[in-house]
Amino acid sequence: DGTVYNARQVIDTVGHLCDYILFDSAWVGYEQFIPMMADSSPLLLELNENDPGIFVTQSVHKQQAGFSQTSQIHKKDNHIRGQARFCPHKRLNNAFMLHASTSPFYPLFAALDVNAKI
């Protein structure tokens, strides 16, 4: 249903071309818990100031306890904090809210909260 990449290889190959890389982890999210898949998890990588920031999207309903259509956005970029390319939380949140629905379905948000507690 998808392709699992070596996250370090992706960053080493294209990281110098961009400020951030988005990993669509719709069908994974569990790789950091399986030792043989650790290289596939962008969230486990040790990054330095020359690496790009990382965004990871996960479809919660595909592998965790969320309702259909629930997803999470993870951001890993402390290693570039202070650099001009760093995306502060406020900017990311404003962009998210710009594209979020004006008619949110609150049970979806509740499902994400429940999932986070599991």
Describe these PLM feature segments.
Residues 1-118:
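Conserved PLP-enzyme active-site core in the AAT-like
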